[in-house]
Curated annotation (Swiss-Prot):
Organism: Staphylococcus aureus (strain NCTC 8325 / PS 47)
Gene Ontology CC, one term: cytoplasm
Gene3D superfamilies registered for this protein in UniProt: 3.40.50.1400
Record-given protein name: Coproporphyrin III ferrochelatase
CDD domains: Ferrochelatase_C (cd00419), Ferrochelatase_N (cd03411)
């Protein structure tokens, strides 16, 4: 008889419509309503990328691709998909409660973030665990997949494809900027999180397996908390690299993210490009993983390694 299990895919979430922006932002700020100025700034950013972020649709597509691939990988298990979001409905708790209502007693959880930190992946897992404990649901968590061969292969291919667009004689004047979402330094140090080291490892593997000669690690999209966050910021890094090495081409791979959304479409494609334009360098940013089979396969391989 086929065993029935849940697949809980967890993600940050994004507003579905403009009226969602205020409650969404309020949830991110732990219930503190944003000022009109902060709210307008966020609305302007969404407007700049063409309205709202494509994140919601892509997250749904990624979750569908994952459950489909997982059901092909396990002949003796039937996985049912549940989507749980951090800052907007359906919330993580709603998804776990629905599992219970459906009679699910065991599930695999995956966060759509390749690198582990207690602030990000750990907080999703904690919320899922707390809700699951109410119903006696057993959860097995995927903690990360930043070094999975297929994940690295995806990014290596993208770097090489981008390099192929650049004249060969300029490859020595090209730098790859590998980045992830910045997090508060104090939290990383307090919890002894492996987050910065995991990003460094991803960058090293891409450098080893691709044709890129120069590589740098940066952080992006930091919050406005008044406390130090991980750095250098990718914009500052771009200027520093240009001043020191006069690179002609900058390739940005925000490997800490898994699809096109506000942080990539605005923070990279607008803010980093503005810096490149200002210094007279060329800006490149390969396509994000989205539902690419190598990306989906990397997560499936990580699940196979723990379940």
């Amino acid at each position: 008889m086929t065993k029935k299990m849940g697949l809980l895919v967890m993600a940050y979430g994004t507003p579905y419509k403009e009226s969602d922006i205020e409650p969404y932002y309020t949830d991110i700020r732990h219930g503190k309503r944003p000022s009109e100025e902060e709210l307008q700034d966020l609305k302007d950013r969404y407007e700049f990328i063409g309205g709202l972020s494509p994140l919601a649709g892509t997250t749904d597509d990624q979750a569908d691709a994952l459950v489909s691939a997982l059901n092909k990988a396990y002949a003796d298990v039937e996985f049912k998909l549940y989507l749980g979001l951090k800052h907007i409905s359906p919330f993580i708790e709603d998804a776990v409660e629905q599992m219970h209502n459906d009679g699910i007693t065991e599930a695999i959880t995956v966060v759509l973030a390749p690198h582990y930190s207690s602030f990000s992946v750990g907080s999703y897992d904690k919320r899922a665990d707390e809700e699951a404990a109410k119903y006696g649901i057993q959860l097995t968590h995927v903690k990360h997949y930043y070094e999975q061969p297929k994940f690295i292969e995806y990014w290596t291919n993208k770097v090489n494809e981008t390099l192929a667009q650049i004249p060969e004689e300029e490859h020595k004047d090209t730098v790859l900027v590998v980045s992830a979402h910045s997090l508060p330094k104090g939290l990383i140090e307090k919890n002894n999180d492996p987050y910065p080291q995991e990003l460094e490892h991803t960058a090293l593997l891409i450098k080893e397996q691709s044709n890129i000669e120069h590589i740098a690690i940066g952080w992006q999209s930091e919050g406005n908390t008044g406390t130090p966050w991980l750095g250098p910021d990718v914009q500052d890094l771009t200027r520093d690299l240009y001043e020191k090495h006069q690179y002609k081409n900058f390739i940005y791979t925000p490997v800490g993210f898994v699809c096109e959304h506000l942080e990539v479409l605005y923070d990279n494609d607008y803010e980093c490009k503005v810096v490149c334009d200002d210094i007279g360098a060329n800006y490149y940013r390969p396509k994000m993983p989205n539902t690419h089979p190598l990306f989906i396969g990397a997560i499936i391989d990580e699940i196979k390694s723990i379940f």
